[in-house]
Swiss-Prot record:
Name used for this protein in its record: Autoinducer 2 import system permease protein LsrC
Membrane topology, from the record: Multi-pass membrane protein
Keywords: Cell inner membrane, Cell membrane, Membrane, Transmembrane, Transmembrane helix, Transport
One MF annotation (Gene Ontology) recorded for this entry: transmembrane transporter activity
Xref: PANTHER family: ABC TRANSPORTER PERMEASE PROTEIN YPHD-RELATED-RELATED (PTHR32196), AUTOINDUCER 2 IMPORT SYSTEM PERMEASE PROTEIN LSRC (PTHR32196:SF29)
Keyword set includes Transport: yes
Classification via NCBIfam families: PRK15432.1 (NF011961)
UniProt xrefs under CDD domains: TM_PBP1_transp_AraH_like
Complex and partners: The complex is composed of two ATP-binding proteins (LsrA), two transmembrane proteins (LsrC and LsrD) and a solute-binding protein (LsrB).
Regions that span the bilayer: 14-34, 39-59, 70-90, 93-113, 115-135, 157-177, 213-233, 252-272, 284-304
UniProt source species: Photorhabdus temperata
Length: 333
């Protein structure tokens, strides 16, 4: 049973989602509807994008705590570009390039300058947040065009254009990680860095790509934020990094690297967003969100650690039992 949970974290995350649906459905019968699912999916899009980027970084046994600041900075650049008269496609391109450059800078700090990821990204967290406030002078960006807001308007099956694009990105990343040698390079890099190098995996390139894609995903999250909210506060992106990491860990991405899948991370992001919807249903204050996200992260880490210890203990017991059995057979003969 323990080994099943460890090897099938996506299934356990899905079971948790269904169980929470059942619990909230008992409280409010109207919760059981397709509209509820699409609303949660719409609310989860920002966190899903951040979880996708964090998946690549965590698979390589690194961590990036600057994604919230990158999201805020990219949202600001998006809003300023549009208000300056640039078209929507050009503004999106500027934003994505900025996100990629921010992620690339993180990757260079970690890979080439050998700075621990947590230290490097803590530094860039403040750097990007400060740059964002310098650009806006601490003010909000308002008056965004309706063209941007239309990206998050419901389309077919009550899902927005961004929602459909997101599903395509999820499927593409899942296929790349599971079915290609390039994708397996992320797992190899996080599982055994030296061993991966001996097998010919370009580990430095893999890690830089992971951070760069993470930056692009944060930029996409900034675009989604601007389109959904319609304005950009000066605190955009605050605290999102913790929720992204919590979603990944909840979905089975190991902090030790080399384990997990993007599907699990997506399910973790959906579950955390579902908890937020439950708080609304229960009429609890919004500041419970961060508390619950932190509690879930801590609980999953404790559970994951205990689960690993239990599995390792069980493996040792089986190994010793086999040796003892062989010794008894030798004594009999």
């Amino acid at each position: 049973m323990l080994k099943f949970i460890q090897n099938n974290r996506e299934i356990t995350a899905l079971i948790a989602i269904l169980a929470l649906f059942g619990l909230l459905g008992v409280i409010d019968r109207q919760y059981f509807s397709l509209q509820t699912v699409t609303l949660i999916f719409s609310s989860a899009q920002i966190l899903i994008l951040l979880a996708m980027g964090a998946t690549l970084v965590m698979l390589t046994r690194n961590i990036d705590v600057s994604v919230g600041s990158i999201t805020g900075l990219c949202a600001v650049i998006m809003g300023m570009s549009l208000n300056a008269g640039f078209s929507l496609p050009v503004s999106c391109l500027f934003t994505l390039l900025l996100g990629m450059c921010a992620g690339l800078f993180n990757g260079v700090l970690v890979t080439w300058l050998k700075i621990p990821a947590i230290v490097a990204t803590l530094g860039t967290l403040g750097l990007y947040r400060g740059f964002m406030l310098l650009l806006t002078d601490g003010k909000w960006i308002e008056g965004l065009p309706d063209e941007l807001k239309s990206l998050s308007a419901p389309l077919w099956l009550n899902i927005s254009p961004i929602g459909w694009l997101l599903m395509i990105l999820v499927l593409a990343m899942a296929w790349i990680l599971a079915k290609t040698a390039f994708g397996r390079g992320f797992y190899a890099t996080g599982d055994n860095l030296q061993g991966a190098r001996q097998l010919g995996v370009r580990t430095n390139s893999i890690r830089i790509i992971a951070f760069s894609v993470n930056g692009v995903m944060a930029a996409l999250a900034g675009i989604v934020f601007a389109s959904q909210i319609g304005f950009i506060p000066n605190q955009t992106g605050n605290g999102l990094e913790m929720k992204a990491i919590a979603a990944c860990v909840l979905g089975g991405i190991s902090l030790l690297g080399g384990t997990g899948s993007v599907i699990g991370a997506i399910l973790g992001a959906f579950f955390l967003t579902q908890i937020n919807s439950g708080l609304v249903l229960l009429k609890l204050p919004a500041w419970w969100n961060d508390f619950i996200a932190g509690f879930v992260l801590l609980a999953v880490l404790v559970f994951d650690g205990r689960l690993r210890c239990a599995i390792e203990k069980n493996i040792r017991q089986q190994k010793y039992a086999r040796f003892l059995k062989n010794d008894k057979n030798n004594q009999v003969t």
